[in-house]
């Protein structure tokens, strides 16, 4: 489960995107403050909902540098989060910045 009272931001390279129902997910490699690289699992909305919101399975690809915000896992040693937004700074393409872009 996630700490819905907290919000974190991670920046890194997308290594995998699973565009499916009931939940999509992305995996990113992101540097920690100590310089170590961590693999984060980020839960997202289902593919059918995301497609209605304008995304496709190729909207984000492995190798994309992304910034993701969301709620972290309640377990601090578990590198997972629930996505609130994702941004690709290279072209400012993102999701989660419009009020209709949510999976609740």
Feature map (PLM): residue ranges:
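Hydrophobic core residues within well-ordered beta-strands of beta-rich domains
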Residues: 8-10, 66
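Short, mixed charged/polar active-site loops
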Residues: 9, 36-39, 94
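Short aromatic-glycine-enriched beta-strand elements
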Residues: 20-31
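Short, basic/aromatic beta-hairpin or loop at an interaction surface
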Residues: 35-47
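Conserved hydrophobic positions within beta-strands
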Residues: 12-14
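Short nucleic-acid-contacting surface segments enriched for D/E, G, S/T with interspersed K/R
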Residues: 51-68
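OB-fold/S1-family single-stranded nucleic acid-binding modules
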Residues: 73-101
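Short boundary/loop segments of OB/S1/cold-shock single-stranded nucleic-acid-binding domains
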Residues: 1-8
């Amino acid at each position: 489960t996630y700490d819905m009272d907290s919000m974190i931001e991670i920046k890194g390279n997308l290594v995998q995107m699973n565009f499916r129902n009931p939940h999509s997910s992305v995996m990113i490699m992101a540097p920690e403050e100590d310089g170590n690289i961590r693999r984060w699992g980020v839960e997202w909305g289902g593919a059918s909902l995301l497609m209605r919101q304008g995304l496709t399975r190729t909207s984000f690809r492995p190798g994309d540098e992304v910034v993701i915000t969301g709620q972290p896992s309640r377990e601090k040693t578990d590198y997972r989060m629930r996505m609130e937004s994702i941004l690709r700074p290279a072209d400012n393409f993102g999701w989660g910045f419009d009020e209709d872009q949510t999976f609740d």
